[in-house]
């Protein structure tokens, strides 16, 4: 027996204990990245079934199910259509409560003859609290309330997102256009509303909200695999993640505990390298590298008593002659904090490796060249 999220069966995975399968993201090409994300809940129900009574079509509007191939590769995307003098407006049939906080609404859209389509988050009383418009021909998404993003996911589909902070109240989400001329139509799939200041990967729902657990990449008790006097930590990743508050990309690597550790982390768009042992902080410096969201970075953190170096994309960024080396026996990827339950942040890793000897500077440059 097997239970999976969504309305479609997946290939059977034999298990004797809990599955421990990494999630892979192919959006950056044919070679996948390891996707690491925090726990999130899709608050919206029937996220792919807009004909369900959970959704409401205003007079003059209609929804036709399963009319075209969605980003999932299955023919399960719906068509929204408005005719006559009616505005297109399809939204939740009933409001739902949200507590005070920051939320992100996302939905997948594909052009079906109407170039300008708007999406929104609406609060009873104040009105629109997040609102934006996609221009299919220009491949842009402009937020008039809140902040927005657009991602081309292929085959004419775009994922648009809206983010804003709200006060507690009752809300609804929707897709609409103010045009009342002719027939207006758009393909729609995969609606999601989640608490947080950025969107995470799509979580399908049916009759109830669904929570996806955090992806934790960690290992303890491996002092024999980590160089205790010298070595190299290596990361190859895309700067696509955010920290728990959304302000930047947060910790990319943390090896060790609160007394002895190596870290690669950021504050905003500034990257840092850090080392500490029981005697105190050894290194805490900027990496002379401004981060650009969506860019790829290859990073090598080399350490040895009196011979530290940091290389990024083939260039030596920092050195240190500190004579001390942290003794570590564990590591976490994309986590803020130590121990078994750190706060997970979002990142996409192409490769992670470590060496128990310090590579030469020439080797570090070659290793990190893109």
Predicted feature descriptions by range:
Residues 67-96, 103-179, 186, 190-193, ...:
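Extracellular glycan-interaction surfaces
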Residues 3-33, 194-225, 317, 350-370:
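Extended recognition patches within non-cytosolic domains
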Residues 170-180, 185, 320-348:
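Flexible glycan-contacting loops in extracellular carbohydrate-active proteins
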Residues 33, 260-265, 281-284, 342:
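Parallel beta-helix/beta-solenoid repeats that form elongated, surface-exposed shafts/blades used
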Residues 6, 19-48, 169-197:
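GGW-centered surface loops in extracellular recognition modules
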Residues 40-47, 53-60, 86, 97-101, ...:
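Extracellular glycan-recognition modules
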Residues 1-9, 49-50, 109, 184-199, ...:
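Extracellular, beta-strand-rich glycan-interacting domains
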Residues 22-32, 53-79:
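Extracellular glycan-recognition surfaces and repeat-rich motifs
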